[in-house]
Swiss-Prot record:
SUPFAM superfamilies: WD40 repeat-like (SSF50978). It is found in: Nucleus. The gene is RSE1. Coiled coil: none annotated. The keyword Nucleus applies. This is Pre-mRNA-splicing factor RSE1. Its main location: nucleus. It comes from Pyricularia oryzae (strain 70-15 / ATCC MYA-4617 / FGSC 8958) (Rice blast fungus). Belongs to the RSE1 family. One of its GO terms (molecular function) is nucleic acid binding.
Length: 1216
């Protein structure tokens, strides 16, 4: 198979994975501030919890291009900084340090110990670090354990030893922690199962007697080797360990968590056991046992032995576990355990990790859905919850005991302060432009159970509106100004109308003032605070300089008026209607002095711009002049060459706005002077203005909308930004992490004018006008450029479909092992409710009641927008499925036999068992749309032998994938009518696509099959299939011969039908040839060719061909299970493909992945990469040090700016 391709695609992530598989706490900056490092897919993200605002702020994110399996933090003795250990699929142990000054991770050590990839005998699955930072243990699922000693050398640098082996054949490791032993030799505890006897037993009896063992491995620092110090048999269901504080803080040892039991174990202590309480409630199964799935230990300040555990079950219930110790005569704990205590604490969503911060917050990395940030209200010590003691229960779990129960309740000890968006698991995705804006929106269904959501994703920045006030007239412009240079806040809002000017004072309230010195009878063109204590008002007939209550007026020459103006704190430039430029500069005494000569331009001046005066300088060196002859000229303002032309740039349309400003620049690493240009055609340009020569270079452009662009310099998060106003409002800024320039739309009203606004109540806001409204608003987050709006759903969504004409979506939802509403109601109404009271708990907090083998499923009608007045966005109708049916597939089908009327068709399965796959029967439900699609009317359902797993409209009929069968149905009065069928798939059809009379069938385990439908003979004939077995999850047709798809192992691929086979299948009368053609290797006679292949490290669940930006080319958009949204952008020219291929090769060697994985091997995890260039790697170029950028640019024979422009352009022209 050739690894080169004649098709090239550029793979980009537009939304990184949002699941968090591992989260750890540490002081990674070297200060006392705690931070959280989270692993999301291949990304490491550093978060800073802000206790004052109750928020979690992402500081930086780094793609390691590898599978992060585990994380651990450690701190060397005497140090104040935590280091991070990464266990990944690279077969290497990686130690990294966070450098706060550069806001990046730096790799300190990379030690190879085994093969790459996730393998059962290669360490990396488990990682534990000694609490005193002296050693770490990295283990595999089977057999291997390696211990590394961590130390310092004479230069106080971190060193790592050669690995010490602690292998044991025939053992499986279930859990691993480091014991807290103070400064004794480091000890690691492991839960292990010995399977060597089971392996040798042909009858299988030994499997019944397998024991789970708790082993202690001690690292002898003196002898430099590892020994197995102690072991003990524990409960056979044990699966998780938690470290118990030791030394002066506690008794040391571990908590061993098994099915419905938590046991304290240590080598020199007795065992103590408490059961995990079960839920009480009418809908709860009183015999169901729980397991601990996550937890955290927290030490309290101030007293020895003060610590507690918060342990969570699979229901989300948190239990507080504490250890009582024997006290000496003075009442101090001795370190000998007296008993174990457990009590119900609160219920929160099920988590992968819990982190308790010293500031009194709890970070919950949710298993599914949004991550949560809680504040502790209290520690649950004085509530009325029942507490259970180990003294009341036997140590041996096999001995009988009375189960204990509790009533779940709303949270009392924890208060939710922030929810962090996460789309894990993302089940389906559609693109549509329902809001009729320039760019379409992405609609997704994600989440699990009652925390599932329907989300609208929109490219833009969220805006926080502070004030929206209606004005007596329609203003054309607005400014704010201080009275003195050293004032902290703005004093006036100045509004310009067509016939006058209104001045408002800013204070506790905003009021009109008249004694300001401003001329109110004319419209205003510019307002500026000048010098130390002056104000300037530019109006069509002149300039007013107001200082200490004295007004100096400069009047424009007779029969001429001012048409454009530019100001800064020391300079004023105006353009007259005659095409002349008049320039003023402030004297040493604070008055404005006019330059003797006027500069005459060739056309009418449309816009002017002066940059800010650089610190330590007297003036801005350049004036930008835009004329109606479609040019921009740069004029010098230096005393020896005042108003001399330095450079000129031709434009495609007349400039409507100019703005010179200094902004952060990724190319130079510092700040650069830019000229921003807005054109009448709606195009925005950004060009570099050389501070020495005045030349204009490196022009980049973006189409913002059909209206002329206005530009304003604003400040957001202490960064200089450009506000660009067209048919939408846009903000241009340097990305906080990459420093690359980004132009992002604002999720706000269309504005006509904008300006900075600084007051006591709003320290960094903006003021704008649209129509008769004055609006004051602020932008809080610059990093997140995708806005999410959520609508809650009932159960886990499975598929999403859109109404063919209306702004309505339909979802099918199903949850396994969950009681359906009718069963819940029966249990609640039963007079003999055996398990407590009949309180109904909100399912989004407590989940739905469990029922083994039961399904809860429904069809929801979702209105994502509402009408803005009476109807709110939300679920407008829900149809619950009964009979233990679960919805699996859905399609909107237009039946030709019903005059093209569209129906919603839903495939269901009855009494399904997921693994091994079992069912009793399947059905196809048909619903008619009514009330403009807002209601569904049940027509009939058709019984089929297997649950339909894929449905599709096809030539005015329905095509269904039912097991291996492909079947065509038409709509009858009482049921669907079977028209044609064929067995086309080896195992199970999971996806269908069609063009013309060709159907593309995706098999669950055997890739794609191309099927031709012959209407003359009403036959379905497979004529081409795949070369390798792909476990298909989703597919879409790229063109008539090519199909893009994805599989369960995280691969994206494009397959193409051979040209000859494609033509043969379409020829009239070819069915005889196709049916009797010779099979090849138990498949069809033709094989599909692989055109492109790449590994994504997520499971793509949906893929579609779409357009994401105005005027952009079509891309392949895919959504992954972990919340990833990515695009594959086709290259238009071979030259671009070759350039990015070369760039990718250089970055592989110059910026190798942080965790040591080979990038090419990573992207070719299962099949070698073919025809796909990694855009996420190419975008790391902007974050490289300057010397590396220059070196790569030299190798590619290009400038740094040129490379960065190409990287930026390919993203902005096709995605966001």
């Amino acid at each position: 198979m050739a690894t080169t391709s004649n098709m090239f695609l550029y793979s980009l992530s537009i939304q990184p994975p949002s699941t968090i598989t591992r989260a750890i706490l540490g002081q990674f900056s070297g200060t006392k501030e705690q931070q959280i490092v989270a692993a999301s897919g291949s990304r490491l993200t550093l978060y800073r919890p802000d206790p004052t605002q109750g928020k979690v702020v992402p500081l930086m994110s780094h793609d390691v291009f590898g599978i992060i399996r585990d994380l651990a933090s450690f701190r060397l003795a005497g140090s104040s900084k935590d280091y991070l250990i990464i266990a990944s699929d690279s077969g290497r142990i990686t130690i990294v340090e966070y450098l706060p000054a550069q806001n990046r991770f730096s790799r300190i050590h990379l030690e190879t110990f085994g093969k790459s990839g996730v393998r059962r005998v290669v360490p990396g699955q488990y990682l534990a670090a000694d609490p005193k930072g002296r050693a770490c243990l990295i283990a595999s699922v089977e057999r291997c354990k390696l211990v590394y000693v961590l130390n310092r050398n004479s230069q106080a640098e971190l060193t790592i030893s050669s690995p010490l082996e602690a292998h044991k054949n025939g053992t499986l490791t279930l859990s691993l922690v480091a014991l807290d032993v103070g400064y004794s030799n480091p000890v690691f505890a492991a839960l292990e199962v010995d399977y060597s006897e089971v392996d040798q037993d042909p009858k299988g009896d030994a499997a019944q007697n397998v024991e789970t063992v708790l082993n202690y491995y001690e690292l002898d620092l003196g002898l430099n080797h590892v020994v197995r110090k102690w072991f003990d048999v524990v409960d056979s269901t044990a699966s998780m360990l938690f470290q118990v504080p030791g030394g002066s803080d506690g008794p040391s040892g571990v908590l061993v968590c098994g099915e419905e039991n938590i046991t304290y174990r240590h080598s020199n202590q007795d065992a103590f056991r408490v059961p995990i309480p079960r839920r009480k409630g009418a809908t709860e199964d009183p015999s169901r046992k729980r397991n601990i799935v996550s937890g955290v230990m927290h030490k309290l300040k101030g007293s020895a032995g003060a610590f507690f555990f918060l342990l969570q079950t699979e229901d989300g219930d948190l239990f507080k576990v504490t250890i009582d110790m024997v006290e000496d005569a003075e009442g101090n704990p001795t370190g000998e355990v007296r008993r174990l205590k457990i009590k119900y604490f609160d219920t929160i969503p099920v988590s992968n990790n819990l982190c308790i911060l010293k500031s009194g917050f709890l970070f919950v990395a949710s298993e599914f859905g949004n991550h949560l940030f809680y504040q502790f209200e209290k520690l649950g010590d004085d509530d009325e919850e029942l507490e259970f003691f180990s003294s009341d229960f036997p140590v041996d779990p096999k001995e009988p005991y009375e189960p204990v129960y509790f009533y779940p309740r709303p949270t009392e000890n924890l208060a939710l302060v922030e929810s962090i968006d996460s789309m894990n698991p993302l089940m389906d995705l559609k693109v549509a432009n329902l809001t009729e804006e320039d760019a379409p929106q992405i609609y997704t269904v994600s989440g699990k159970g009652a925390r599932s959501t329907f989300r609208m994703l929109k490219h833009g920045l969220e805006v926080n509106e502070i004030v929206a006030s209606q004005l007596p007239g329609t203003p054309s412009a607005v400014w704010t100004t201080k009275l003195r240079r050293d004032d902290e806040y703005d004093a006036y809002i100045v509004l310009s109308f067509t016939n006058g000017t209104l001045v408002l004072s800013i204070g506790e309230t905003v009021e009109e003032v008249s004694d300001t010195g401003f001329l109110s009878s004319v419209p205003t063109l510019a307002v500026q605070q000048l010098g130390d204590d002056g104000l300037v008002q530019v109006h069509p007939k002149g300039i007013r300089h107001i200082r200490n209550g004295v007004v100096n007026e400069w009047s424009s020459p007779q029969h001429r008026s001012i048409v454009a103006a530019a100001t800064n704190e020391r300079q004023v430039a105006v353009a007259l209607s005659s095409g002349e430029i008049v320039y003023f500069e402030m004297d040493t005494d604070g008055s404005l002095a006019e330059y003797d000569e006027k500069k005459e331009m060739f056309g009418t001046v449309t816009s002017l711009s002066l940059g800010e005066v650089p610190e330590g300088r007297l003036r801005s060196s350049y004036l930008a002049v835009g004329c109606d002859d479609c040019t921009v000229r740069i004029l010098s303002l230096d005393p020896e060459s005042t108003l001399e032309s330095k450079s000129v740039q031709a434009l495609t349309a007349a400039p409507s706005a100019l703005s010179i400003m200094s902004m952060e620049d990724s190319s130079s690493g510092g700040t650069t002077l830019y000229l921003h240009i807005g054109l009448n055609s709606g195009v925005y340009l950004r060009t570099v203005l050389d501070e020495v020569t005045g030349e204009l270079t490196d022009t980049r452009q973006k189409f913002l909308g059909p209206k002329a662009v206005r530009l304003f310099q604003v400040s957001v998060q202490k960064r200089t930004c450009v506000l660009a106003l067209s048919s939408r409002s846009w903000l241009g800024f340097s990305d906080p992490v990459t420093k690359g320039f980004t132009m992002t739309p604002l999720n706000y009203e269309e504005l006509e004018w904008g300006w900075n606004f600084v007051s006591e109540q709003c320290e960094e806001g903006m003021v704008g006008v649209n129509g008769q409204f004055l609006r004051i608003f602020a932008i809080e987050k610059l990093g997140d450029n995708v806005i999410q709006k959520s609508i809650p759903l009932t159960y886990t969504p499975r598929k999403l479909a859109k109404h063919p004409t209306q702004r309505i979506f339909y979802t099918i939802e199903a949850d396994n092992n969950t009681l359906a509403p009718e069963l819940r109601e029966q249990l609640m109404a039963a007079p003999t409710a055996v398990n407590g009271d009949a309180r109904v708990l909100p399912p989004d907090e407590f989940g739905y009641p469990r029922g083994n083998g039961r399904w809860a499923s429904c069809i929801s009608v979702v209105d994502p927008l509402g009408d803005g007045e009476e109807l709110e966005p939300g679920v407008v109708q829900r149809i619950d499925l009964d009979n233990n049916e679960a919805a699996l597939s859905m399609a909107v089908v237009s039946f030709a036999s019903q005059d093209g009327e569209s129906f919603l068709v839903v495939g269901t399965g009855k009494d399904m068992v997921v693994n091994p796959r079992r069912f009793t029967e399947g059905y196809i439900h048909v619903y008619r749309f009514s009330e403009d699609g807002r209601e569904l009317e049940f027509i009939h359902k058709t019984k089929v032998e297997e649950p339909p797993t894929a449905l599709l409209p096809f030539q005015g009929r329905l095509v269904a994938g039912i097991g291996r069968m492909l079947r065509i149905y038409d709509l009858g009065l009482r049921q669907l009518l079977r028209k044609a069928q064929a067995e086309v798939a080896p195992q199970l059809i999971v996806s269908l696509n069609t063009q013309g009379s060709r159907i593309i069938v995706g098999d669950v385990q055997h890739g794609l099959i191309y099927v031709a439908y012959k209407s003359e003979t009403n036959r379905l004939i497979p004529f081409a299939d795949d070369t390798i077995a792909r476990w298909t999850t989703c597919t879409t047709m790229v063109d008539y011969d090519s199909t893009a798809g994805a599989d369960k192992f995280g691969n994206l691929w494009i397959l193409r039908c051979p040209e000859k086979a494609s033509q043969e299948s379409d020829e009239p009368g070819s069915e005889v040839h196709l049916v009797h053609s010779r099979d090849y290797l138990h498949g069809t006679s033709n094989r599909l060719a692989l055109m492109a292949h790449v590994y994504t490290q997520d499971i793509p669940t949906s893929i579609c061909k779409t357009n994401l930006v105005v005027g952009g080319q079509e891309v392949l958009l895919w959504g992954g299970f972990q919340g990833t949204i990515g695009v594959l952008i086709p290259f238009v020219s071979r030259e671009d493909a070759d350039f990015f291929q070369s760039l990718e090769q250089h970055l592989r060697s110059e910026d190798p992945p942080l965790a040591g994985r080979d990038h090419l091997m990573y992207r070719g995890c299962y099949v070698p990469v073919k025809g796909v260039i990694d855009g996420d790697l190419c975008e790391r170029y902007t974050m490289l040090p300057n010397d590396k950028k220059q070196m790569i640019a030299g190798e590619l024979d290009r400038s740094v700016r040129e490379i960065e422009r190409k990287i930026s352009d390919i993203r902005t022209r096709s995605a966001f």
